[in-house]
């Protein structure tokens, strides 16, 4: 009788230990997945595509940074731009304020990016190191987290 009781206690103890270990592994895995998503704020987002079309390589890659104070800044490829934004859970509203007006060679990408900055963004999505800005019709621009050049 005593051996059966000890055996049952041992089995229950092992089951509890296995359950705790599996729970800890799942929690660690979930934390790792969540940690892989870059934050919207203070990440150097490099433009990858506009309306589903990849942009060509440029000397200065078009980019945007959303700052903690509610402002955004970036480079169109030649000119710099700035404005304000408001964000909540997966929601974003951007107010473009202005840009410099230097004349540069091949401003096709710059004009396309600038035109889209005037879109009425409503949502954003971050999947690991990819930022997607969306309007009411879906994806407008896609960015990847890059390294800001010095």
Model-derived features: positions:
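Bacterial N-terminal signal peptides that target proteins for export
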Residues: 2-12
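Lipid interaction determinants
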Residues: 5-7, 21-150
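Bacterial N-terminal signal peptides
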Residues: 11-21
């Amino acid at each position: 009788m005593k051996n059966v009781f000890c055996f049952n206690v041992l089995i229950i103890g092992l089951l509890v230990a296995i359950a705790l270990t599996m729970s800890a592994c799942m929690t660690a895995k979930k934390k790792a997945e969540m940690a892989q998503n870059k934050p919207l704020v203070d990440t150097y987002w490099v433009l990858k595509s506009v309306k589903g079309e990849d942009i060509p390589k440029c000397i200065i890659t078009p980019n945007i940074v959303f700052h903690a104070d509610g402002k955004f800044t970036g480079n169109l490829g030649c000119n710099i731009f700035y404005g304000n934004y408001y964000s909540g859970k997966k929601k974003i509203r951007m107010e473009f304020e202005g840009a410099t007006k230097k004349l540069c060679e091949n401003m096709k990408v710059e004009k396309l990016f600038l035109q889209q900055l005037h879109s009425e963004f409503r949502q954003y999505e971050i999947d690991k190191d990819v930022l997607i800005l969306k309007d009411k019709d879906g994806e407008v621009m896609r960015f990847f987290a890059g390294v800001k050049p010095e």
